[in-house]
Design a protein with these regions (language model features):
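Start-transfer (signal-anchor) and selected internal transmembrane alpha helices
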Residues: 1-39
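Transmembrane alpha-helices of multi-pass, membrane-embedded glycan-processing enzymes
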Residues: 94-97, 107-118
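Extracytoplasmic loop-helix module adjacent to an early transmembrane segment
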Residues: 29-36, 43-71
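Structural signal for the C-terminal ends of transmembrane alpha-helices
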Residues: 13-25, 44-45, 117-127
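Short hydrophobic/aromatic helix or loop-helix immediately within or flanking a transmembrane segment
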Residues: 55, 59-66, 70-102
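Membrane-interface micro-motifs in multi-pass membrane enzymes
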Residues: 1-6, 108-109, 143-151
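Transmembrane-helix signature of polytopic, membrane-embedded enzymes
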Residues: 26-29, 120-140
Length: 151
């Protein structure tokens, strides 16, 4: 829990130095980039016992690694045909990722990048108060995001 509080404190500190005095587009961009990097580190390098579903997704990640491509494509095809198969697109996504890395921690960092970069860009473009946007995300929405967001 203390690491989340530290993250929020750092967001306030960066906002104070970058957004409070003589704000500019470049400072806003730097703030959003720094906050994004913080969240990628926090989310991507979390322990396996953080979050209710991290261990389950880890097991699923390695189980998918043992599943043949033929089975993955058959499941996707069956799902498109109307069969009730749980998350065939997620299995395909993980299998494609495993072409590049079979390390689950690398996968978590990749997922964090995939989620946080677009979010930071959106905040940069659409928020007049990026500090508040990141704080709201930090306090309200992060608990809903994990690998579940990709699934």
């Amino acid at each position: 829990m203390s690491v989340y509080l530290l993250n929020i404190a750092l967001i306030f500190i960066w906002a104070f130095f970058l957004l409070k005095y003589k704000p500019s587009k470049n400072k806003k961009k730097a703030f959003c980039a720094i906050a994004c990097v913080q969240w990628v580190i926090l989310s991507g390098l979390r322990g396996m016992n953080v979050g209710a579903d991290t261990i389950g997704y880890r097991r699923s990640f390695y189980r998918i690694g043992l599943t043949s491509w033929h089975r993955i494509f058959a499941d996707v095809s069956d799902y498109i045909g109307g069969a009730e198969i749980k998350d065939p697109g997620y299995a395909l996504f993980v299998k494609i990722f495993q072409v590049f890395s079979t390390n689950y921690q690398v996968y978590l960092v990749f997922i964090a990048l995939l989620f946080m970069i677009p979010m930071a860009i959106w905040i940069y473009r659409n928020s007049s108060m990026p500090c508040l946007s990141f704080i709201i995300f930090s306090t309200l929405f992060y608990s809903f995001y994990a690998v579940t967001g990709i699934r």
